[in-house]
Curated annotation (Swiss-Prot):
This is ATP phosphoribosyltransferase regulatory subunit. The gene is hisZ. One of its GO terms (molecular function) is histidine-tRNA ligase activity. One of its GO terms (cellular component) is cytoplasm. Heteromultimer composed of HisG and HisZ subunits. Required for the first step of histidine biosynthesis. May allow the feedback regulation of ATP phosphoribosyltransferase activity by histidine. InterPro entries: aa-tRNA-synth_II/BPL/LPL, HisRS-like_core, HisRS/HisZ, HisZ. It holds the Pfam family tRNA-synt_His. Pathway: Amino-acid biosynthesis; L-histidine biosynthesis; L-histidine from 5-phospho-alpha-D-ribose 1-diphosphate: step 1/9. It comes from the Bacteria. This function is generally fulfilled by the C-terminal part of HisG, which is missing in some bacteria such as this one. Belongs to the class-II aminoacyl-tRNA synthetase family. HisZ subfamily. Its main location: cytoplasm. Keywords: Amino-acid biosynthesis, Cytoplasm, Histidine biosynthesis.
Length: 372
């Protein structure tokens, strides 16, 4: 489909992609909805335009490019490493601006040198913006979900709580709500007394049989809902989560970590100092963080011009490590956002593990920034 009403800087953008030896790729506007609903995160899920095929398959208008580019890579069985670029329309329900707008970006798939690929993504994003909005002061913010995951794991929380906190990473309001619940647990209410008795005695088989008989008596079909075993295990997890309390020292450590905000050039020493003071072993996560900072320096990116915020994340569930955003100084409008998504291609059906990192440029916001 020919692209119309492109911004006047589109030619410069395409030239930048070509100079970085990317393969230009296009994907269908109509996409299967399931991958986005499963993997994209709540913020994007509620903005998707959904529809159905005549056979009842759930479809959507393309809400972003990362998942479609990855699906196309898997379907064409293309080898890696591979660098893709894209430029096209995406469709989202938004309170401000149009519902359809242009997005462009680069997806870097299969490079095993994680630090180098991360540095290239950040460096390319900054360099492209410097060409598109020349003379404008940029603000770059970087976070690392893998470091947050390492901190949560080192604190020894139950796996259910770890998953909840990691899922909320980047959403401070949601994180603060979860931390408040960890500080002051609330008992589970409304449970069937018989189910509660099985749970407190740890009798999973008895609980499953009780749930099964209840479902049969009330006409619930296991084909249309969760199985008795699934329900039993979710109830057990819910009870464990409700009884878990984060002690005062662990709570203080987690809050101290989330409050870290320093220039990236100082971040490695700040994180090492935090880990030593808290007695936490963050191992590989810190090693990868340090390697990325070094790779950024080797790529000529000034780490002193980038802010590291330990609590910073992006509202997409598929990120696994590096996350970053670029704005104009003094503005909250994100011009570029990106990060690492090492698990995504496997979840989408790739036979082999494919590390990946990329970023997207918001062309309508860049157009506004150019006019400012």
């Amino acid at each position: 489909m020919p692209l119309i009403d492109l911004p006047d800087f589109a030619g410069d953008l395409i030239a930048e992609f070509a100079a970085r030896r990317t393969d230009r790729v296009d994907t269908p506007i109509i996409q299967p909805a399931e991958p986005f609903l499963d993997m994209a995160g709540e913020d994007l899920r509620r903005r998707i335009f959904l529809t159905e095929s005549e056979t009842g398959a759930s479809l959507c208008l393309r809400p972003e490019f990362t998942i479609p580019v990855c699906l196309q890579h898997i379907e064409t069985a293309t080898g890696t490493p591979k660098r893709y670029s894209y430029l096209g329309e995406i469709f989202r329900q938004r309170r401000e601006g149009g519902q359809e707008f242009y997005q462009a970006g680069i997806e870097d798939l299969g490079d095993r040198d994680i630090a180098s690929a991360d540095a290239r993504a950040v460096g390319d994003a900054i360099a492209i913006l410097n060409r598109l909005v020349p003379g404008k002061a940029l603000s770059v913010t970087l976070g690392d979900q893998a470091v947050f995951e390492a901190v949560v794991q080192a604190l020894g929380l139950p796996s259910g709580w770890q998953k909840r906190l990691i899922h909320a990473f980047g959403n401070m309001m949601q994180l603060e709500t979860l931390l408040a619940r960890l500080a002051s647990p609330q008992p589970v209410t409304g449970l069937d007394p018989h189910a509660l008795d099985f749970l407190t005695r740890g009798d999973e088989q008895g609980l499953v049989m009780h749930i099964d008989s209840t479902m049969q008596a009330t006409g619930y079909s296991t084909n249309a809902s969760r199985s008795p075993l699934e329900i039993a295990r979710r109830l057990r997890e819910k009870l464990v989560l409700s009884e878990t309390r984060l002690d005062d020292e662990a709570f203080r450590v987690l809050e101290e970590f989330l409050s870290l905000s320093v220039p990236l050039a100082d971040a490695s020493s700040a994180l090492a100092g935090f880990a030593d003071a808290a007695g936490l072993k963050l191992g590989t996560a810190l090693e990868r963080f340090d390697a990325r900072v070094a790779a950024l320096a080797n790529a000529g990116v000034d780490a002193g011009s980038i802010d590291y915020r330990a609590a910073f994340g992006r509202p997409l569930d598929y990120y696994t490590g590096l996350v970053f955003e670029v704005t104009m100084e003094g503005s909250a409008a994100v011009l570029v956002g990106g990060g690492r998504f090492d698990r995504l291609l496997t979840l989408l059906g790739a036979k082999d593990h494919i590390p990946a990192v990329g970023f997207a440029l918001w062309l309508d916001r860049i157009e506004t920034a150019r006019a400012a």
